[in-house]
Amino acid sequence: MDSLFVEEVAASLVREFLSRKGLKKTCVTMDQERPRSDLSINNRNDLRKVLHLEFLYKENKAKENPLKTSLELITRYFLDHFGNTANNFTQDTPIPALSVPKKNNKVPSRCSETTLVNIYDLSDEDAGWRTSLSETSKARHDNLDGDVLGNFVSSKRPPHKSKPMQTVPGETPMLASAWEKMDKLHLEPSLDVKRMGENSRPKSGLIVRGMMSGPIASSPQDSFHRRSLRRSLPSSSSTQPQEESRKVPELFIRTQQDILASSNSSPSRTSLGQLSELTVEKEKTTASSPPHLPSKRLPPRDRARRRDPSEDTLAVDSSTDADRMPLKLYLPGGNSRMTQERLERAFKRQGSQPVPVRKNQLLLSDKADGELGTLRLEDVEDELIREEVILSPVPSVLKLQTASKPIDLSVAKEIKTLLFGSSFCCFNEEWKLQSFSFSNTASLKYGIVQNKGGPCGVLAAVQGCVLQKLLFEGDSKADCARGLQPSDAHRTRCLVLALADIVWRAGGRERAVVALASRTQQFSPTGKYKADGVLETLTLHSLTCYGDLVTFLQQSIHQFEVGPHGCILLTLSAILSRSTELIRQDFDVPTSHLIGAHGYCTQELVNLLLTGKAVSNVFNDVVELDSGDGNITLLRGIAARSDIGFLSLFEHYNVCQVGCFLKTPRFPIWVVCSESHFSILFSLQPGLLRDWRTERLFDLYYYDGLANQQEQIRLTIDTTQTISEDTDNDLVPPLELCIRTKWKGASVNWNGSDPIL
């Protein structure tokens, strides 16, 4: 197995631990110092499957205080079952050690290997069983590829020729009963192992081959090679070339009649004292055998995840403990005593139906893995699983078509001039510390929290797009109210889609540029430019496919959600996707800029995020303004119906006129501009803007990320009861005035909430 894959799986375990523990800043730091790769696993269910932790996960869920992370599950498993490994085997006499010389095949060494190998020589009187237990006290963990913790992916080893197994009499009734039940259900056949060239010989006792009388030092490579000799590659041909045998072994799911091969036997192995192998035979015949499923054409990652066939080898442990079976059968996957106990418990719980054995599980998963590009539907037991999904899944096969380059000084100058009107200006602290973090208040989990004033226009626009995804797209369409109680994973997913829509729309639905921060400075500020510590570190990623854009944002969503510069990164991404040239063409006055005094968002910036164009007005289409001297000035407005609407207090004061493209959007969500602040207003009724009868009496929900809301604000709008416009405006909340620019004279009931004045 590739060490890179092992490293990525381990890193994914750490990321999952950090994510579940809420260590968001640590996650960001880890992603920056150790970026994800194509081998990274970013979905908790996938990670659990790679490590085969399904059984531990189910057991954990049944506990009163379940653990939250896979790393904790693994840790508890080892502490519970292998903390006292040395006590599992009592030693009354000195145990000889065995050394196996190196072979020509070079195998990697392990620093954790012991240099002495312990051999337990059990006599033939023990019911005819003979077993060799190697490295029991120090290297028991090497065989932890069992059913419980799950068949760790084996390393790349040279394959060996197959050999049959032999029958050993003396099975206990319980063990025989277990095999009979497995036979009836056509589950996994018994896997027999025998040395090459030997005939089947029914015996009660077997000879321990290669025993030496004294302790002999053995290198880590020797002990590692001994284990590799116990692995095997089943193949349809015994004349496989040596060059081909050095490749990654191909795994076949064999029929019930097939015999699993064991390690290749050689004269040196017999004469130099290789560990003897237990041979057990159970002959089975069944007509319903699964076909061969070679993994030859699967991608490297999928091949790496397949188990070595030797992990299906049966090992038997003889024990005299009162609380254990006299004869223990270790099912495919390694020497974990929990496997037998699980099998026995399963027989008692399910009657005659044993738990599915590892090979059948592997067959099903291999079929699914073999169909690249298809989504695998999983059995979801409860809603908790949805919350455990770690976002940012990186595709293992598909490569993103991304062109990346660092920002340069000229681009940074253009952006700053477009934002502030001068390259000497910088983002203030309100902008630098603002990202798209969600509220932890139970009734406001859908809301993005604003730290201070300034980028409220960007936050409101993103909030509207997130609500669009939460309420009216995907599975939320059937139950909009449920969309207001999203899981952490679901709301983050909706944030990804919202950001993707914004930058894709700004790029004319043809391209997008995503600006991400790095830990290195990309250029040295010189001349008429003032550094702010943000633009100088950017890397610009160009994409021309919407699907790639969504996937790319999933991988980097921490920079937007956790920050610290998420708001700045989105603003710059929208600008670069649109391009500075086209944005200046959108302006009525070419010298306009996107951020006004005190760091407030301009109407141009809000329009850029909502419609993809940084026009200066909110009316429909284009207005020709005749100055009277023959010169006509074109004032650009909104060109088409927007997904998210816009209402303004300025319209109440007759300063501007919001057109129907913004006032009647596709979705009942409006960004509200009131007294230099942007907030959000939305409805849960998707047909509110399509059926005039629903506009007689309906509810609107109000959210202000800066108002420190602690509860949901629900307004009931009644258009059948009109309010006189002559009412003293000083006592009327500005929000009501904004609402009446859309529904003239409507009454607004705050339903017990304090009106925001």
UniProtKB/Swiss-Prot annotation:
Swiss-Prot/TrEMBL GO biological process terms: protein K48-linked deubiquitination; proteolysis
Composition skew (Basic and acidic residues), residue ranges: 192-201, 299-310
Highest taxon listed in the record's lineage: Eukaryota
Catalytically driven reaction(s): Thiol-dependent hydrolysis of ester, thioester, amide, peptide and isopeptide bonds formed by the C-terminal Gly of ubiquitin (a 76-residue protein attached to proteins as an intracellular targeting signal)
Keyword Hydrolase among UniProt keywords: yes
Biased composition (Polar residues): 254-277
Sequence segments annotated as region (Disordered): 141-170, 192-335
Task of the protein: Probable hydrolase that can remove 'Lys-48'-linked conjugated ubiquitin from proteins.
Name assigned to this protein: Probable ubiquitin carboxyl-terminal hydrolase MINDY-4
Lineage: Eukaryota, Metazoa, Chordata, Craniata, Vertebrata
